[in-house]
Every structure is written in structure tokens, then in C-alpha cells.
């Protein structure tokens, strides 16, 4: 069965560049981003992992951990990390999972479950579907899933924007409009009646249509 938004993120125990982890225990009571890449020592992936390393302080501020995954070995990850730091200017400062038996990739739907063989037998093209992103909440449920083609590097700034939205809407009964950024107006969700909205937003709201109710971003 394929994973859906709202499903519990499958737990696993795995070897990483920072030692063995139990995924759910590693997440703890915060947020996590699990992102995978098709192959070590490839150009697009090199730029991605270097860039996200530079953004780690931004994720830390949001109580969100980062963890990478590919079907390469932990030893390969460590060697490749030297190239990433040399070429991208940022040292990899988060763990990378070595999923050499393909089990995590299969569990998360990155590789067909009936695929046989080992990671050593697979090329980057074989692993083309292993360029996924999962945002996981403190309840260990999947909040966002993205799959990118091999030829397109991911926009991790957009991932921060989405994380801001997810964290805000987890606390308040609002949704965020197109291209929303922190500090901009948000939308009262339809499930909140006008009577309840008056209690939660006593200063009122802008309403160009009855079903569109805009308010300033709630403060924690």
C-alpha cells in the first residue's frame, strides 16, 4: 500500500554517517525532513546536499531535523561528503542513511517493492525515483510528500516556506494562501463558523467573498 498524507511515517533502524538510529526515536518531539537522492558522486545531488547543509540553522530554528538517504553505503556517503564540502563550501552537517538493502526506499515507495538485487548493481538511472522529500510532524505522521525528477534539483527554500505553513496551521485554525510567507495574511479555515471566528479573531477579518476570510498571521 502506498503512503498517503496523514499516514504514520514507517519506523526503521538504520546505519547512518552519525551512527545507528531508530528513526522515530531520532525525530523525538520535533519535526523532521527525510530526503533521498538517487546516487552519491552525482552532480545535482552534490549541489542539493551542499545547499541544504547551509540552510541547517534555518531548520534548527524551526525545531526540524534533517536526514538524507540513498541506497549507497555509509562509507560512500562519508567519502562523497568530502567532495560536497570542497565544491559547495558547506560541510554535510546532518546524518545520511545508507540503505544498501533498499528496504527503506521500498517501504517509502521510492523503489518498487518487487525490485531485487543490491545497491551495488544499481545505477543512478535505476534509482531515478529515489529523489523524494517527506516532512514528518512531532506525531510521526507524514505532513508533506514531494517527488522530483533526476534532472531537477530541489528548492529547499520552498521547503522552509512549507514548513512555516505546516507549523502555523498545526497551531491555529488557519490556512495559508498562494505564495504565502511569514508575516503575511492567512485564511480562516471554512470549518470555523463566523461566530467562532469572532471569538478567535476579535479584530475581525477581510472578506471579499463569504468563503474567503483573511486575517493577520496569528502570533504564538
Which residues does each predicted region cover?
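Chalcogenol-based redox active-site neighborhoods
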Residues: 1-220
Amino acid at each position: 500500500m502506498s503512503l498517503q498524507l496523514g499516514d504514520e511515517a514507517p519506523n526503521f533502524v538504520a546505519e547512518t554517517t552519525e551512527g545507528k538510529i531508530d528513526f522515530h526515536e531520532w525525530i523525538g518531539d520535533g519535526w523532521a525532513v527525510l530526503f533521498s537522492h538517487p546516487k552519491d558522486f552525482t552532480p545535482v545531488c552534490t549541489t542539493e546536499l551542499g545547499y541544504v547543509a547551509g540552510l541547517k540553522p534555518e531548520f534548527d530554528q524551526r525545531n526540524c531535523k534533517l536526514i538524507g538517504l540513498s541506497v549507497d553505503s555509509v562509507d560512500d556517503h562519508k567519502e562523497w561528503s568530502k567532495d560536497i564540502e570542497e565544491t559547495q563550501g558547506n560541510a554535510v552537517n546532518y546524518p545520511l542513511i545508507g540503505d544498501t538493502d533498499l528496504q527503506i526506499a521500498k517501504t517509502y515507495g521510492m523503489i518498487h517493492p518487487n525490485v531485487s538485487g543490491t545497491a551495488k548493481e544499481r545505477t543512478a538511472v535505476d534509482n531515478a525515483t529515489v529523489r523524494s522529500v517527506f516532512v514528518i510532524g512531532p506525531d510521526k505522521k507524514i505532513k508533506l510528500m514531494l517527488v522530483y525528477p533526476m534532472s531537477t534539483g530541489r528548492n529547499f527554500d520552498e521547503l522552509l516556506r512549507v514548513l512555516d505553513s505546516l507549523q502555523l496551521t498545526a497551531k491555529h485554525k488557519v490556512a495559508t494562501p498562494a505564495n504565502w510567507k511569514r508575516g503575511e495574511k492567512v485564511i480562516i479555515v471554512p470549518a470555523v463558523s463566523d461566530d467562532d471566528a469572532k471569538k478567535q479573531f476579535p479584530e475581525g477579518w477581510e472578506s471579499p467573498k463569504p468563503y474567503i476570510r483573511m486575517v493577520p498571521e496569528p502570533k504564538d
